[in-house]
């Protein structure tokens, strides 16, 4: 019996260190909810090196910090992360950093109130929580940054969000001085530069598609295509290099081909022809056409197979397919439409987000 008592005593853990500070926590939640970036910067400056305990991973701490405090990053590097989340331009504001092993992982809030973290080793920006309140309640789930790492410490059990000074946590051995990973980074910097170039090209492509994506109805799309006939929109997809806008009446095909196209259309929904898809600059043959339906779905019609195929749930997904293969999270298919219908918001995601896009893909 004594042996069991000894073992129980050996593995007994203590309540989480730190003090409750409901006022500070409430202020931080409100600033993040209303995306008050100047207010967040002032608060993190005022409470620099205050650490907030998180429930998951076990016994993790969020250190409130300024850009200069995050080990392994320059201020310019942090500023360049605004377009890292699968090509979206999401303005970010640094809240602080968590420590995984000896590595600093910066935590951001975006203009959509979503919470992100960045892993320097794979140069990927991860979406980790719908808002700061859920971040505090549930911690960080479902990212490679966390699941591949050991908990920072296990001597205390979590009993609610508490604040503690960084120096106190260091004295207790709960946090350590972070390593500057720039000196011993395993990530291939040549690959990082290539990814940055791909992101720039991707953003440029979305800019070209942006006006088309803002159309709210098929009638608006039809009008846009008719007044921009012949306009070439560059694509960064694995196969196609450009979309050349062309309306249905100017598609050069025989009567039988046109009838076959209409038969295929009847199997799905009413569609508007967007134009031809170019495979290369020297492609002068019968090129496939791209269409968009009333639901916003994208369709591909091949004149050889004479089959209309649904290839994406919206224009944005079609545009992302080529980019997603270069991303660590491969999450483009989980994003779905930017809003309930295509258009309404910019494909760049720069307008205020009224409705979270990942709900719409479920």
Swiss-Prot record:
Database matches in Pfam families: US22
Top-rank taxon, per record: Viruses
Family stated for the protein in its record: Belongs to the herpesviridae US22 family.
Protein name: Protein U8
Biological source species: Human herpesvirus 7 (strain JI)
Lineage: Viruses, Duplodnaviria, Heunggongvirae, Peploviricota, Herviviricetes
């Amino acid at each position: 019996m004594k042996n069991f008592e000894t073992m129980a005593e050996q593995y007994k853990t203590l309540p989480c260190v730190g003090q409750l500070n409901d006022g500070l926590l409430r202020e931080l939640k409100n600033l993040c909810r209303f995306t008050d970036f100047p207010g967040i910067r002032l608060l993190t400056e005022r409470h620099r090196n205050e650490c907030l305990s998180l429930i998951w991973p076990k016994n993790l701490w969020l250190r409130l910090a300024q850009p200069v405090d995050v080990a392994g990053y320059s201020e310019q590097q942090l500023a360049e992360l605004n377009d890292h989340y699968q090509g979206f331009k999401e303005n970010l504001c640094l809240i602080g950093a968590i420590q995984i092993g000896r590595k600093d992982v910066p935590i951001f809030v975006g203009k959509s109130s979503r919470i992100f973290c960045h892993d320097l080793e794979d140069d990927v920006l991860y979406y980790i929580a719908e808002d700061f309140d859920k971040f505090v309640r549930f911690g960080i789930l479902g990212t490679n940054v966390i699941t591949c790492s050991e908990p920072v410490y296990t001597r205390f059990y979590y009993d609610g969000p508490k604040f503690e000074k960084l120096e106190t946590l260091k004295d207790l051995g709960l946090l350590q001085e972070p390593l500057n990973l720039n000196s011993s980074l395993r990530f291939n910097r040549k690959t990082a530069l290539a990814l940055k170039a791909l992101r720039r090209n991707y953003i440029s492509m979305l800019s070209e598609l942006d006006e088309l994506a803002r159309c709210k109805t098929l009638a608006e799309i039809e009008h846009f295509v008719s007044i921009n006939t012949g306009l070439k929109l560059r694509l960064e997809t694995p196969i196609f290099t450009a979309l050349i806008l062309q309306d249905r009446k100017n598609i050069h095909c025989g009567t039988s081909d046109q009838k076959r196209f209409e038969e295929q259309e009847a199997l799905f929904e009413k569609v508007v022809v967007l134009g031809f898809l170019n495979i290369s600059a020297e492609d002068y043959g019968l090129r496939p056409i791209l269409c968009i339906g009333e639901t916003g779905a994208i369709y591909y019609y091949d004149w050889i197979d004479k089959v209309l195929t649904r290839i994406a749930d919206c224009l944005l997904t079609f545009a992302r397919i080529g980019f997603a293969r270069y991303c660590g999270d491969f999450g483009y298919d989980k994003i779905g439409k930017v809003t309930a219908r295509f258009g309404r918001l910019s494909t760049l995601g720069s307008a205020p987000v009224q409705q979270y896009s990942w709900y719409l893909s479920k």
